[in-house]
Amino acid sequence: MPSNLIEVILNRFMSYLITPEGYKPLLDLKQTELGIKQIKEFFQLNLSSELRLRRVTAPLFVLKGMGINDDLNGVERAVTFPIKDLGDAKAEVVHSLAKWKRLTLAEYHIEPGYGIYTDMNAIRADEELGNLHSLYVDQWDWERVITAEDRNVEFLKEIVTRIYAAM
C-alpha cells in the first residue's frame, strides 16, 4: 500500500497510461528534466526569431466573469478559488489564452508581422486522462498580427514552414 498521498495520486493517474510491454526509458528522471529544459530553451529562441514574436508572461488565473478565460468546447469547468483581498472575488485558472492573447497584442501595440508567445501553464479538470492529456498543461501559445492580405492559404503554409524551421 502506498505510504503517502502523492504515491496514491500518482498510482491512480498512472492507471490511465498505456506503456508498451518491455518499454525501457532511454533517459532517467534527471536527464528527462534537463532534456525538457534544453528543448524549451532552443524552441523558444528559434520560434521567436522565425515568427518575430516577443515573450510575454501568461496569467495563471483570471477573474471570473471577465470573458477572458475561453470555454474550449462548452463543457469545461474552470478550477476556481476565492481571492480574500478582493472580497472573495472568484478567480479561474486559465485553460485557454485565445482571448487573452488578442487583448495582449492590442495592449502592447503589436504591429502586423509581429506577435507574442508565452509558455502557458494551466489545469484542465475535465480533461480525459491518458498518454496525450493530463490535468496539468504546459504548452507554448502564440499569436501574431496579420493583415487582411495575409489571410490566405499560402501565408499559412509559410508560417507552418517557419514553425518547422524553428524545430
Regions of interest found by a model, annotated:
Residues 152-157, 161:
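A conserved active-site cap/scaffold subdomain adjacent to cofactor or substrate pockets
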Residues 46, 159, 166:
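Residues that form generic nucleotide/phosphate-binding pockets
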Residues 16, 162-167:
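Metal-assisted phosphate- and nucleotidyl-transfer catalytic regions
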Residues 11-133, 141-145:
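Class II aminoacyl-tRNA synthetase-like tRNA-binding/catalytic domains
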Residues 148:
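Active-site nucleophile-His-acid catalytic modules used for acyl/amide transfer and hydrolysis
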Residues 1-12:
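N-terminal amphipathic/basic-hydrophobic helices that include classical n-h-c signal peptides
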